[in-house]
Design a protein with these regions (language model features):
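Residues on the lipid-exposed face of transmembrane beta-strands in outer-membrane beta-barrel proteins
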Residues: 19-23, 95-99, 110, 149-153, ...
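Outer-membrane beta-barrel signature, preferentially recognizing the C-terminal barrel domain
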Residues: 60-61, 68-107, 135-158, 204-207, ...
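Conserved small-residue
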Residues: 137, 154-258, 298, 316-320, ...
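Extracytoplasmic gating/loop element in the C-terminal half of outer-membrane beta-barrel translocons
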Residues: 4, 284-377, 382, 400
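Short loop/turn motifs that connect adjacent beta-strands in outer-membrane beta-barrel proteins
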Residues: 26-41, 102-105, 156-163, 176-181, ...
Length: 430
């Protein structure tokens, strides 16, 4: 049982619990016939709940700020509060196995997880005419289901040589299970929910589903085009689409989501006659990210203040009468819609990073003991060696969100990728 001062006293307390069990099957008598090849087999399961109150302070009351003008102080409205918000609850179920075979030359774990989130805490957007843009509310339920696999291999193991390989992967499916009626204010492609920023939160959809205009290329005179629904006399879509050069007339569509299909890491290490070498990679496959940095670098000048700004090299391939087949609109002073939000700037968020490389040598003990040293290792290491992504300069790991995990799906060029570091040293044990 826990309480949080971030909620109204009437909703401050929450009850959370957990229980788990494991069974080492290989210790049972009926498994005695497998001891020649099966070293360990464990079956495990757990279920429990935990609360989330990470929404900031005083979200349950209206807040105000002091403002100064011409030496006079006044009180101005800051944020809208909601006294009904309460704990977001995550109920986690995990079940899996751990195993080791062939003298643990092959070992690992396989685990299924099902995480259900109820009473999701999110900022709910409102009409600007209300005097505030959003307020926090418990907006619905969500599930994350998937599988985690961790495998370890030792192809070579001898007195002086050992080679290890490790691979891990995670696959998950995210879905909004339910939204209360007051949140189902809009229907998009058969899903009911609400729109906020560049996302649509709908029942049956992943949480971070992009909702924006679809880019349709350039017109014959080089202007940007967007798709637009054809409607009947009652204003209802007929299922057909046309194009328009007016951004405000373009229709919004579901454009994929930011959650990857697969992510994890892999690596290998080798030790031989005192030398050791290791290398590790991280990866992500699938998901989308909105590359706002690229959009800014492809914008056209809108004022004299644009003098001196730089562009991406792709701008050199923009439409011109001599280059009529380009998919990049013409450079036109004052065109403020060229880089407005659309799936033109959505990009595959897959990446591969060479996380670290290390190399070392451990001196023979018969040599170090002459100096009263039990063990001495000389090493050289490099961290954050390299990463590959769909576009040079784009690092999907550092998106515009609070946990820097790239989940929110919006690039943030104000956040630098980790710097590459090269280090070396000597480890001494007495």
């Amino acid at each position: 049982r826990d309480a949080s001062s971030r909620f109204h006293p009437s909703h401050r307390w929450g009850n959370f619990w957990s229980v788990g069990a494991a069974w080492i099957v290989t210790k049972e008598n009926f498994m005695s016939g497998t001891h020649g090849w099966l070293d360990m087999l464990k079956v495990k399961a757990s279920i429990g709940s935990q609360g989330n109150d990470k929404i900031g302070d005083y979200r349950y009351v209206d807040t105000y700020r002091l403002a100064s003008s011409n030496g006079e102080m006044s009180v101005a409205f800051l944020e809208k509060g909601n006294p009904n918000i309460t704990w977001e609850t995550n109920t986690n179920f995990n079940a899996g196995i751990e195993f080791g075979v062939l003298q643990n030359r092959i070992s690992g774990s396989i685990e299924y997880f099902n995480r259900k989130t109820t009473d999701m805490l999110m900022a709910f957007p409102t009409a600007p005419s209300l005097g505030y843009s959003s307020y926090y509310a418990n907006v619905g339920d969500m599930s994350n289901k998937g599988i985690e696999v961790d495998l370890n291999f030792t192809p070579i193991r001898s007195k002086n040589v050992q080679w290890d390989i490790n691979v891990n992967l995670t696959h998950l499916k995210n879905k909004i299970i339910s939204l209360p009626p007051e949140r189902r204010t809009k229907e998009v492609e058969g899903y009911y929910g609400y729109a906020g920023s560049s996302f649509f939160y709908g029942q049956g959809l992943p949480l971070y589903t992009f909702y924006m205009k679809k880019y349709a290329g350039v017109s014959e005179d080089g202007r940007s085009m967007w798709y637009k629904d054809v409607t009947d006399k009652d204003g209802k879509p007929t299922g057909e689409r046309t194009t328009t050069t007016a951004y405000s007339e373009g229709s919004d569509y579901l454009c994929g989501n930011a959650i990857p299909d697969l992510y994890g890491g892999f690596g290998t290490s080798v030790s031989f006659f005192g030398f050791d070498f290791g290398i590790n990679f991280n990866y992500q496959i699938g998901g989308k990210i909105y590359d706002s940095g690229y959009a800014a670098a492809m914008s056209t000048p809108t004022s004299t203040g644009s003098i001196g700004v730089n562009w991406h090299k792709d701008i050199l391939n923009a439409w011109t009468p001599e280059n009529p087949n380009s998919n990049i609109p013409r450079m036109q002073y004052g065109d403020s819609n060229t880089t407005d939000t659309s799936d033109r700037f959505l990009i595959d968020a897959s990446y591969l990073t060479l996380q670290n490389i290390n190399f070392g040598y451990t001196l023979p003990s018969k040599f170090t003991q002459k100096f009263g040293v039990g063990k001495m290792r000389i090493y050289l290491a490099c961290e954050n060696v390299f990463y590959w992504s769909k576009r040079k300069g784009l690092d999907p790991r550092y998106a515009d969100n609070t946990d820097n995990q790239g989940v929110l799906g919006t690039s943030n060029y104000a956040t630098y990728s980790p710097i590459r570091t090269i280090s070396g040293g000597i480890n001494i044990q007495f």
